[in-house]
């Protein structure tokens, strides 16, 4: 290999390194780097020239002119050089082409972006305008969510207190002096579409009962259940008469519903069904929501029969007897808290 070839190879190597530092290697882009092959071709040429020289020397050796140990060393060195050159040759590998660039699918700009581009404003102004519109939309969404939450709370409150208003309205609210009739008229507000529930417009007995319900609900949340469930002091014979009369009213209500084909909701065992007189007369304040004697019977534990000292544990697979049961029956070892060890005195 001449000096010109060495200079050419060095220049190509420097150019290749500069290109790779700026753009990356050609192999990573899916192309073949031919500058590397030039070096290998030159090396192979040199090695072929060395082989020819060695063959000439070999012919001389056959003639019987020169025979020494140095020739054998040179041959072994040439063989190792040939093996190294064969190993240094690049192996053929499949090309991997990666498309990391933008897609060729055309996405047309929206009408909003077209308008902004036609206006002749800069990109910063356009981005600021877009950010301001997005912030406004987020604020509108937050206000809408807050309004929806407020409406949900008002609806739940109205559903809890609607039975009070309906009970008072059915029970003699046709008179002009009734507070409930005035409440319903004010809640209607002259609209034929429906009643708009507003808390400030509830007046009369309905307002006092609704406020009492809310206070009781808050006290239940805070854990004052016993104070709420505490009954008013009433003589025993009067309370019994009130309970009997209330039970008769409930039976009459259920009978009328059965005759009319109305399916009523189920009530827990021992509790009173809530009807109009329950809310109208506020009877639960005096007699409670259920009969106390039946509640006590329900709360009592069931008798499980005689307590017999049994052995083992019965399962579906049979009787399982533990070592502790065997030791307890045989009496060989003391079983207990201290495992047969005597408690030492201090």
Swiss-Prot record:
Basic and acidic residues: bias regions: 31-65
| Highest taxon of the lineage | Eukaryota
Q: Does the keyword Nucleus apply?
A: yes
Stretches of Acidic residues bias are at 72-85
Q: Does the keyword Glycosyltransferase apply?
A: no
Keyword annotations of the record: Nucleus, Ribosome biogenesis
Q: How does it assemble?
A: Interacts with KRR1.
Q: What is this protein called?
A: Protein FAF1
- In the UniProt record, the gene name given for this protein reads FAF1
């Amino acid at each position: 290999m001449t000096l010109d070839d060495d200079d050419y190879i060095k220049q190509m190597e420097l150019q290749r390194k500069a290109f790779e530092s700026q753009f990356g290697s050609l192999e990573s882009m899916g192309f073949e780097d031919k500058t590397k092959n030039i070096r290998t071709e030159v090396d192979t040429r040199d090695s072929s020239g060395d082989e020819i020289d060695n063959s000439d020397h070999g012919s001389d050796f056959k003639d019987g002119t020169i025979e020494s140990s140095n020739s054998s060393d040179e041959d072994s060195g040439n063989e190792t050089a040939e093996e190294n050159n064969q190993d240094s040759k690049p192996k053929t590998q499949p090309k991997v082409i990666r498309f990391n660039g933008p897609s060729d699918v055309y996405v047309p700009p929206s009408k909003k972006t077209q308008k902004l581009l036609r206006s002749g404003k800069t990109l910063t102004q356009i981005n600021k305008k877009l950010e301001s519109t997005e912030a406004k939309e987020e604020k509108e969404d937050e206000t809408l969510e807050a309004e929806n939450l407020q409406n949900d709370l008002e609806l739940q409150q109205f559903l809890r207190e609607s039975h009070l208003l309906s009970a008072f309205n059915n029970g003699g609210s046709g008179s002009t002096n009734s507070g409930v009739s005035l409440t319903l008229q004010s809640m209607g507000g002259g609209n034929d579409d429906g009643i708009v529930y507003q808390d400030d417009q509830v007046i009369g007995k309905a307002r006092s009962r609704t406020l009492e319900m809310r206070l009781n609900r808050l006290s239940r949340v805070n854990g004052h259940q016993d104070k709420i469930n505490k009954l008013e002091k009433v003589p025993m014979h009067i309370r019994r008469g009130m309970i009997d009369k209330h039970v008769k009213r409930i039976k009459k209500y259920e009978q009328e519903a059965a005759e009319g084909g109305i399916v009523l909701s189920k009530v827990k065992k021992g509790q009173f069904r809530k009807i109009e007189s329950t809310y109208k007369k506020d009877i639960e304040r005096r007699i409670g929501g259920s009969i106390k004697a039946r509640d006590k019977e329900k709360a009592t534990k069931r008798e499980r029969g005689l307590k017999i000292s049994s052995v083992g544990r019965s399962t579906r697979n049979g009787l399982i007897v533990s070592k502790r049961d065997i030791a307890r029956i045989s009496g060989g070892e003391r079983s207990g808290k201290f495992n047969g060890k005597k408690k030492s005195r201090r």
